[in-house]
């Protein structure tokens, strides 16, 4: 008779070692060296010693977790959020803001092989004007969870407060939770978004089943009592306006309207400074023709139009092109035009590009702009400002400009998301004469 044996699970004993941390990476992990190998340890800061357990051992590097911290860095801070360390939203509340900015700037400088000229920052707390909170009904307790995802998990952290949220939004958290937790449709809710616009506060509720008249009435009463613009989203395509007018925000003296689902920069303060610095770096003159690629609904395009002879905004999403045109009309700007184009194709052959451009600005998504770099080079602008939310693709795309005879004149780290691992940046390229 054949006999079958289950293979015994291999057990590994985690090695406990003592390390000294000498650096902080841009994601907020302490960096140490052990046996000639780089070791990444979340939760530790430079100048700290600790006993750590190795959790992952690769050929080039290893990861570890803290068993016992033996000393504290002078730049260690007490996290303001009670959910820090569990919630996946923030990774660096234990580090001083100055240390966070230095570590991100150093990472950017290494990637770009160029010194960081400046850090563009604003308030480090209460800066986030948009939040998307996951909702989950717990049948056992008949309670509604509302919060953000746990670090490295799809589980939800039931968030009671969030100090990086705009104060108006943080104050709403318990009230929104109580309202949604009283709905008959509590088990059919997907997420809720809160947005703080200049025009007021928005609440967008994603529900996966039709709402009863009683639930709709309850939501309307809540929105009126809290002064919210209320939107209901039964699916990803439909958005019903229950109350409120078209929202808008200020951008360098202009009023930009947007749909509740449109992308807007989360950090209003840094956005204002970023736009102002981009215009300054481009040195826009009254006779200039300026091209804005990946322009969205005109965050840079419209402020550029207040200084240049003419501005062309190019965007791949038709709805954003329409919104840009609408915003130009609302602000009385007649020297700006928006075009819907596939930026992977050669747009330099379009009629609007035949006269060339003196200056170019681009603000692509995380994938970068590899498909348009040669097109920009063909246009031969004097100055180029590249705004990036991914330093790796920025470094890759920059190579084409450097080979074409451009040099990096300025490099800024944008502290758009304090206390997180997100690193944004802006570069000025100048053509060598």
From Swiss-Prot:
Q: Share an example GO biological-process annotation for this protein.
A: rRNA base methylation
Query: Which residue numbers delimit the TRAM domain?
Result: 10-68
Would the keyword Ion transport turn up in this protein's UniProt record?
no
What GO molecular function terms would the record report?
4 iron, 4 sulfur cluster binding; iron ion binding; RNA binding; rRNA (uridine-C5-)-methyltransferase activity
Q: Which residues of this protein are catalytic?
A: 389
List the EC numbers from the record. Answer: 2.1.1.190
UniProt-listed InterPro entries: 23S_rRNA_MeTrfase_RlmD, MeTrfase_TrmA_AS, MeTrfase_TrmA_CS, NA-bd_OB-fold, SAM-dependent_MTases_sf, TRAM_dom, U5_MeTrfase_fam
Protein name stated in the entry: 23S rRNA (uracil(1939)-C(5))-methyltransferase RlmD
Q: Which organism is it from?
A: Shigella flexneri
Q: Which gene is this protein's source?
A: rlmD
